[in-house]
C-alpha cells in the first residue's frame, strides 16, 4: 500500500507547504481510514519487517538483493506512518529475524486454532500456501474490488492438487521478486506439470529417472537449488509470537494525538473526521495545500471497497499484505470479511 500510494502520485507528488512528499502517507491513511469506516473490524494490527536481516537473508546473501533502493521519500514516510498507527491505537507487530509474511503465517494459524476465520488481503501468490478452509486470500482485482480465494480456488488457478503445493511450485519455478532462484530453465508451466505428475518436490527428486532429456538433466543438476528455494519460499508459521486476541481488539483512535499529526502533514480532509472541538485548530490554506486538497479529492475517486463474501456471524480475522520500505511489509489487518482496496495502479496476478 505504501509503495503503491507513493507511485500513484509520482507524476504530481503530494507536497505540503514545507516541501515534504506525503504521497505514501496519505495514500496509506486514506485506504486505512476507509477500511475502518466501512468494515468496522473487531481486531486489527499492522506488522512490519524488522530493520535488520531475517533468517532468509542470513541463509542466502542474495535474497531480495536485486531490488532497487527504497526511495528516500518512502523511507521518510514509514516512521510517520507508525506514529499515525500509534495515535490510532493500532498495534504494530515486528519480530527480529522474521519477515512480516512469517508473522502473518504464524498469526493466521494461531487465530484459526482460536476459532477465527482468517482473511489475508494480498497480491502475493506466496500466501496461497497458508490457505485452508478457515484462512482465505483476498486478492485485489485491477478493476477494483476483491477476489476471495479459498483452497479450491488456489488449486484451480494453478492446476494443483492441494494448496500447500504452492511452496513446491515456487521452489521449482523460483520467484524473481524475492530473487529465489528455483530450478533454472523450469518455468511456471513446467513446474505445474511436474507437480501434477509427481505431487511434490520430494517425490520428483526421488524419481528423476522418469524424466527425459534436458529436463532430467536440469533437475538432477539443481537438486540443492530446488530444495533451498523451497526453504526460502516457505512462510514460517512458528514465529515466537503469541496470538493475544484481547491486545488486538480494535479501539477508537486517540484524536488528541492524531489530529496534530494530520495538521502537521496538512491532511485537511482527514482532519474533518475529528471531533469539532479538536478539529478547530485549522491550518492556513497555502497554494501547496490547495493543490493537496485537489489531490485528496482525486484519490477519493480511486479508493473503493467491495465485499466479496457474505457477512459471517462468527469471529473474523483478516490480514492485508502490502509492501513498504526497508524490505518491510505492512501486512496485517485483523478484521471482518470486507477489505479496502486502493487501486493506485493496475495490478496483475503474477
Question: What are the residue ranges of the model-derived segments?
Answer:
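Noncatalytic, basic helical substrate-engagement surface that gates or grips nucleic-acid strands
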Residues: 1-121, 125-152, 225-228, 234-242, ...
Amino acid at each position: 500500500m505504501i509503495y503503491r500510494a507513493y507511485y500513484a502520485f509520482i507524476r504530481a507528488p503530494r507536497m505540503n507547504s514545507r516541501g515534504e512528499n506525503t504521497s505514501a502517507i496519505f495514500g496509506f491513511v486514506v485506504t486505512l481510514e476507509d477500511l475502518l469506516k466501512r468494515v468496522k473490524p473487531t481486531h486489527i494490527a499492522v506488522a512490519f519487517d524488522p530493520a535488520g536481516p531475517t533468517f532468509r537473508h542470513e541463509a542466502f546473501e542474495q535474497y531480495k538483493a536485486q531490488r532497487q533502493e527504497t526511495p528516500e521519500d518512502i523511507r521518510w514516510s514509514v516512521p510517520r506512518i507508525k506514529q499515525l498507527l500509534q495515535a490510532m491505537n493500532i498495534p504494530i507487530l515486528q519480530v527480529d529475524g522474521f519477515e512480516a509474511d512469517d508473522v502473518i503465517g504464524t498469526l493466521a494459524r494461531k487465530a484459526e486454532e482460536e476459532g477465527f476465520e482468517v482473511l489475508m488481503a494480498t497480491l502475493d501468490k506466496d500466501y496461497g500456501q497458508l490457505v485452508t478452509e478457515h484462512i482465505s486470500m483476498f486478492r485485489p482485482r485491477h478493476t477494483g474490488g476483491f477476489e476471495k480465494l479459498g483452497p479450491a480456488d488456489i488449486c484451480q488457478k494453478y492446476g494443483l492438487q492441494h494448496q500447500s503445493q504452492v511452496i513446491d511450485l515456487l521452489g521449482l519455478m523460483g520467484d524473481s521478486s524475492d530473487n529465489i532462484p528455483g530450478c533454472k530453465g523450469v518455468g511456471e508451466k513446467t513446474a505445474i506439470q511436474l507437480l501434477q505428475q509427481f505431487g511434490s518436490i520430494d517425490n520428483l527428486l526421488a524419481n528423476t529417472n522418469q524424466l527425459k532429456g534436458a529436463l532430467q538433466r536440469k533437475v538432477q543438476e539443481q537438486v540443492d537449488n530446488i530444495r533451498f528455494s523451497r526453504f526460502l519460499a516457505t512462510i514460517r508459521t512458528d514465529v515466537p509470537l503469541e496470538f493475544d486476541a484481547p491486545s488486538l481488539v480494535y479501539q477508537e483512535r486517540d484524536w488528541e494525538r492524531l489530529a496534530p499529526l494530520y495538521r502537521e502533514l496538512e491532511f485537511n480532509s482527514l482532519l474533518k473526521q475529528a471531533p469539532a472541538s479538536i478539529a478547530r485548530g485549522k491550518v492556513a490554506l497555502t497554494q501547496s495545500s490547495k493543490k493537496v486538497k485537489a489531490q485528496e479529492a482525486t484519490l477519493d475517486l480511486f479508493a473503493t471497497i467491495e465485499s466479496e463474501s457474505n457477512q459471517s456471524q462468527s469471529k473474523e480475522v483478516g490480514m492485508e499484505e502490502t509492501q513498504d520500505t526497508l524490505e518491510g511489509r505492512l501486512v496485517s489487518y485483523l478484521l471482518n470479511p470486507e477489505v479496502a482496496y486502493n487501486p493506485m495502479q493496475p495490478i496483475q496476478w503474477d
